[in-house]
Amino acid sequence: MNAFNKANDQEETLYEAVLEEISSGRLEAGQRLKVSELATRFGVSTSPIREVLRLLQGEGFVEIHPNRGAVVKQGDANTIQNIFEVLQLLEPYFVSWFADYAQPEMIEEMEEIQRKIEEVPSGNLIEFRKLDFEFHWAICRRHYNQVAADLWKKLRKALNVHGAKLRISPVRYQTIMEEHQELLEAFRTHDAVRAEAAINKHVAGSFTQMSQQMRALGL
């Protein structure tokens, strides 16, 4: 690996690490991001931290203000709605294809992820969201259209960032488990129509839960 590629890989790893801190809520909306503190936290110099913050600013996750520096951007209801409107188009596209073409080992991988989700202790939203992402990414990453898959990945990460402070009610949590099982059953029987219906319900339910919380918080 040459020096250029190594530097790019390090920047990408650092970017993912900072983004994970934001999406997990460990770096909260409105929190000031001090370059020196982040450099110490991740064991790097200040230059790559500044570059990562510029990248995060470009993607709408961070705001950089003169004399104040960088802060984690506060999510809002309009952003959440815009993301979900695109996901409502992408998700059926992926699951209908997966229902038609998924091999047994692909479905088994999803079943294993779902087992892990169901074992997550109540209230551990960081681990739950990580595994929920993996569950859906197991569908998207195998699709032939990687442009669409990369767009989905970007939107889901954005959703996790903007919704980091939101909670999942016990009722919604149970519904998510049931909807995941409904998807798995549709995949096992290669029923694309059933899979589309399940994912449409799943996405709509998540949007309702998140948008209601956003409005309640005045965002």
Feature roles, as predicted:
Residues A204-M214:
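Short arginine-rich
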Residues D9, E108, I126, V171-Q174:
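Short helix-capping and inter-helix turn/linker motifs at the boundaries of alpha-helical repeat units
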Residues V95, D100-K165, E178-A186, R194-A204:
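Conserved amphipathic alpha-helical segments that form helical-bundle/coiled-coil interaction surfaces
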